[in-house]
């Protein structure tokens, strides 16, 4: 039995030493790991590569095309036998003008390329926000568990004291039961918070690809960057910042501009196209073929192509593009309406959360002071054990409310920051002053 206890003690000490030696990973490193690990970020990146290629394809229409073709022709004639000729042809074609179709397509591709870059940054921002939210939840549940453990230590000491008092006949058995009930209630809370903490840790590990321990997550006391963030409480100023920095708004504006270029291209299709065409043909006759019948030739000319009728295809295409443009404008209006509502709602929730945190903090301080008084009065016999336990419960509930409201404030700051800026830039630590200057 002694050997077994020795090994258990050794294992516990080793585990504690190992836990204390685990490196604390800063939040910025966790975000970087998630950006590297999450496939959605890579998918968004390759979308930018596709749009860059689409832009190159659109620009390729500005250049001439040069083709080389070779062919062998056999021509059997009864009078002269078989004539053979190897024809080598070099063709040069260049579109002189199409009255704006190519330019409109290039500008559209540029807007789509810009949208893909913005969407890439948006994807990174979403992943960053998920990591930071999970980090906050981990930190919150760790604080909850720490609070539970402190309460359990108090009740365990009280249980030891009452065990001695009961055995000596000074206290009653029911007093011990009251203390044990409080410990059981705290154990239930501890299990619940631990389950929530484990769930958030699994989420963090899934997002980052790292095998983490809760002790490796940077504690809230050592991470105060979001505490320093000045919450924008002016809806007009916040709306201006959204229209300047928000990724969704940028994408919608570029989509509208791309639709404008589609309309321009559709209107330009009513005009003719003018092409410069040149070709050089080199003939190499053989067999019974005569050289005079297969002379080399060089041609050059200008082709003008004008569509007279194509079943109203051009007008249908123009109407389609006009509808797409109207749709893009309405999507911007819809975004602005929803954003204004979200801003008003966010500001209202922030004001309530700030007031709630202030009240909860004050309530926790008062509850602790009340508990201290009850402890003194309990020792003097002026308060019952039930009174003391009730005061401890009130203090603990105030602690839970204070922690909840504190992290509610953090989450609201995080949501606003994600709305107007890229979290990764903010986490670099060199943009905080810039953000506050913009306000």
Task: Please place each PLM-identified region on the residue numbering.
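Acidic, low-complexity, intrinsically disordered peripheral segments
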Residues: 21, 28, 401-439
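Small/polar (Gly/Ser/Thr/Ala-rich) solvent-exposed segments
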Residues: 42, 65-85, 93-122, 250, ...
């Amino acid at each position: 039995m002694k050997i077994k206890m020795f090994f258990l003690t050794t294992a516990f000490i080793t585990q504690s030493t190992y836990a204390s030696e685990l490196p604390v990973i800063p939040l910025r490193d966790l975000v970087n790991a998630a950006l590297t690990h999450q496939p959605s970020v890579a998918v968004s990146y390759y979308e930018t590569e596709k749009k860059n290629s689409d832009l190159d394809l659109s620009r390729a229409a500005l250049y001439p095309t040069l083709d080389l073709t070779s062919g062998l022709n056999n021509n059997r004639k009864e009078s002269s036998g078989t004539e053979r000729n190897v024809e080598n042809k070099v063709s040069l074609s260049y579109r002189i003008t199409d009255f704006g179709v190519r330019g409109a397509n290039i500008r559209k591709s540029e807007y789509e390329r810009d949208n893909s870059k913005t969407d890439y940054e948006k994807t990174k921002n979403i992943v960053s926000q998920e990591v930071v939210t999970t980090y906050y939840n981990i930190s919150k549940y760790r604080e909850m568990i720490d609070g539970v453990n402190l309460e359990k230590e108090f009740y365990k000491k009280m249980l030891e004291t009452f065990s001695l008092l009961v055995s000596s006949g000074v206290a009653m058995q029911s007093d011990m039961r009251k203390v044990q009930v409080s410990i059981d209630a705290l154990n239930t809370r501890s299990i619940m918070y631990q389950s929530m903490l484990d769930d958030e840790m699994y989420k963090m590990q899934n997002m980052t690809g790292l095998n983490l321990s809760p002790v490796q997550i940077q504690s809230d006391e050592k991470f105060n960057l979001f505490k320093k963030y000045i919450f924008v409480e002016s809806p007009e100023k916040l709306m201006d910042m959204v229209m300047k920095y928000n990724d969704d708004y940028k994408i919608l504006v570029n989509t509208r501009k791309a639709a404008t270029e589609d309309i321009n291209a559709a209107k330009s299709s009513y005009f003719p196209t003018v092409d410069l065409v040149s070709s050089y043909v080199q003939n190499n006759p053989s067999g019974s073929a005569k050289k005079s019948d297969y002379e080399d030739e060089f041609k050059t000319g200008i082709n003008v192509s004008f569509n007279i009728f194509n079943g109203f295809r051009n007008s249908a295409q123009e109407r389609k593009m006009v509808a797409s443009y109207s749709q893009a404008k309405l999507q911007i209006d819809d975004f602005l309406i929803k954003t204004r509502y979200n801003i008003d709602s966010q500001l209202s929730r922030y004001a309530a959360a700030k007031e709630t945190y202030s009240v909860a903090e004050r309530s926790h301080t008062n509850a602790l002071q009340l508990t201290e008084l009850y402890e003194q009065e309990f020792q003097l016999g002026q308060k019952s054990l039930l009174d003391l336990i009730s005061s401890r419960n009130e203090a603990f509930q105030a602690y839970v409310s204070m922690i909840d409201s504190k992290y509610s404030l953090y989450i609201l700051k995080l949501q606003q920051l994600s709305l107007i800026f890229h979290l990764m830039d903010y986490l670099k630590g060199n943009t905080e002053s810039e953000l506050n200057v913009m306000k």
